[in-house]
């Protein structure tokens, strides 16, 4: 009763200026309520015919492929093309700790990074398979993952098929190769830059998460893949 009216108001404002809006809760225990709000939003009469509604999914969640199936069905039922931002996930430690504290039989996330990497590619393939219903947004700073998606998407690229995304100030050398011209030996694919905006108090926690997420990627070998 409190959250949805705010979300709806914000989405209507986004439509007024034709700015896409993604629902991103991240934590596994907020997934259901996030999907409930997304479904309600997709059937708002005032938002009919607008393809600026999006959702963020985390590849480290074991439910991720099934969430994608639901999102594809939702896009079909609501007769719109949903933006789906695919990330690997930045709250692994919190998810593991919460599952342990709650005494769960298993974890909601994969416990090995290699499994998350494979999940990301499997989910990317599902998203690319329904271009009429899904606009994939691939958020990654991993060169191996990026190259695999480029290959999965095929060479018959057309504007609006998909996009890559990076965080402001991170992965710039990699994305210079992505957005450069084919004539210069580069990929010529779009990249959206995510730049956080807010107060110092709000941004500090975000910055710490990004530092923790990428703090281990300092060696030369890791930099090749990240």
Where are these regions (language model features)?
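Positively charged, amphipathic and often flexible ligand-engagement surfaces
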Residues: 1-226
């Amino acid at each position: 009763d409190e959250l949805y009216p705010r979300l709806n108001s914000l989405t209507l404002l986004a439509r007024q200026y034709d700015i896409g809006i993604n629902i991103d809760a991240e934590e596994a225990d907020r997934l259901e309520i996030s999907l409930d709000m997304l479904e309600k939003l997709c059937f708002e009469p005032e938002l009919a015919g607008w393809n600026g509604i999006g959702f963020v999914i985390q590849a480290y969640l074991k439910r991720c492929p099934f969430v994608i199936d639901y999102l594809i069905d939702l896009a079909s039922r609501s007769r719109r093309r949903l933006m789906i931002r695919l990330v690997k996930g930045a709250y692994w430690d919190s998810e593991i700790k919460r599952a342990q504290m709650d005494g769960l039989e298993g974890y909601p996330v994969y416990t090995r990074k290699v499994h998350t990497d494979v999940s990301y590619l499997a989910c990317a393939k599902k998203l690319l398979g329904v271009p009429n219903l899904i606009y994939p947004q691939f958020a990654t700073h991993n060169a191996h993952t990026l190259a695999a998606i480029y290959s999965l998407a095929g060479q018959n690229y057309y504007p609006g098929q998909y996009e890559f995304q990076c965080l402001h100030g991170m992965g710039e050398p990699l994305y210079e190769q992505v957005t450069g011209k084919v004539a210069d030996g580069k990929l010529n694919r779009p990249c959206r830059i995510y730049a956080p905006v807010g107060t110092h108090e709000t941004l500090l926690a975000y910055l710490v998460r990004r530092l923790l997420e990428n703090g281990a990627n300092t060696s030369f070998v890791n930099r090749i893949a990240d």
